[in-house]
Amino acid sequence: MGSVSAKKGVIVLVPYCLQGHMTPMLQLASILHSKGFSIIVAHTKFSSPNPSDHPEFIFHALPDKLNGFDTSFMNLLNVMEAINSSCGGPLVDYLVEIMKDKGQVISCIIHDAIMYFAEAVASQLNLPSMVLRTSNVAFMESHRDILRLHSENRFPLPDSELENPVPGLDPLRFKDLPVSVSSRIHDKIIEFFESYMNIRSNAAIIWNTTQVLEKYALNKLHHHYKVPSFAVGPFHKMVPASSSATSYINEDRGCIEWLDKQAPNSVLYMSLGSLSTIDEKELEETAWGLANSDQPFLWVIRPSSVNGSGWIEHLPEGFQEMVGDRGLLVKWAPQKEVLAHPAVGGFWSHCGWNSTLESICEAVPMICRPCFSDQIVNSRYITHVWKVGLELEQPSDRRVVEKTIRRLMVADSEEKEMRQRMLDLKTQIESSVQKGGSSYNSLNDLVKFIASFP
């Protein structure tokens, strides 16, 4: 553990350990550091960041009691519960040490919404706290509706209601809510949602979003919570150019050389993110639909992302011979750089919020293949609100896969209109992060807000 030299003050950031949460928290850290704050990142030992990627920060590992714990995707709720029950005491001890023994003055604690134990720590130590929401506002609104339906004893919903719109959350349907509403929701899930949604004594909410995409939802949220909300996203567009990468997974940079040889807007980039998985049947149907589409592709198949498979051994026989040099398979890619490449004309996406923002910022229309949680909500907004993507209605049908790929990648009036909408959003977002823009102004307001803490 090193020491920090306070400039405007010391901010303690408490990220959640998964890639999709760690990335925006470290981006926020870089943004605030560039504004003159010193940064301490208090993280779990499990799935911890690499301190050498950010030598400008102090990193402190919190004992999380996850050694030997089942940390698989199916047990994530228990992982979250274990972290919140075990990390509070160690964080108190660490902060008391640096405040009393080292004389450092902490301006505030900013914690991921999942790491709600940090708010209790802040209250105990009389420190201001703020919560970072790494998803979009619509996802948080969907949680509020789940809690409302639960309080009205509406679960399970009958099949006849699943296609109906959720009141006040158009265009979301009940089946788009981020839990299975056609069955009883376990009490533990409801308890987690209540903790996740409750801002308690947090002084403000920070969002990795922009008024360009969610102005109405942000205004609605402000009226509900009555605390300041700072929409300072997209974070990756606000981060100083010198900031280091935040990926846990080794990136195959050879794919950039391959893209350099492809025609403009010709390549379909495919990735389901750092957590989502598919079964062997979907892999096979996706592969044949892709092969039959005759479109060039860069396909990220993360190791163990296909159930029962180490990597690509379950790809159908003859697939790689059929596509030849038209396609490239990699284990992981430098996604922001890939999406910014002129050869990339489409993104087969799981619709995680980070990926959604990155795709919109590079004006790359999407094929939406959501798997769980906020991805389902994001997909609906991509296809029905911003109208910059296509829904993959049957991912395990090669004919549907082929048709959807062709529909996105082969230029016609619909595809041209979608690309124009993407370009318009990209232009608006670029303006929002420049001087006088909504995100630029919101960041300045956030800096002033933190600096106002005693």
UniProtKB/Swiss-Prot annotation:
UDP-alpha-D-glucose binds at residues 274, 350-358, 372-375. Keywords: Transferase. Transmembrane segments: none annotated. SUPFAM superfamilies: UDP-Glycosyltransferase/glycogen phosphorylase. The keyword Transferase applies. It comes from the Eukaryota. GO terms for molecular function: quercetin 3-O-glucosyltransferase activity; quercetin 7-O-glucosyltransferase activity; UDP-glucosyltransferase activity. The keyword Cytoplasm does not apply. GO terms for biological process: (-)-secologanin biosynthetic process. Expressed in leaves. Low levels of expression in roots. Iridoid glucosyltransferase acting on a broad range of substrates, including both 7-deoxyloganetic acid and 7-deoxyloganetin, curcumin, genistein, luteolin and kaempferol. Belongs to the UDP-glycosyltransferase family. This is UDP-glucose iridoid glucosyltransferase. It comes from Catharanthus roseus (Madagascar periwinkle).
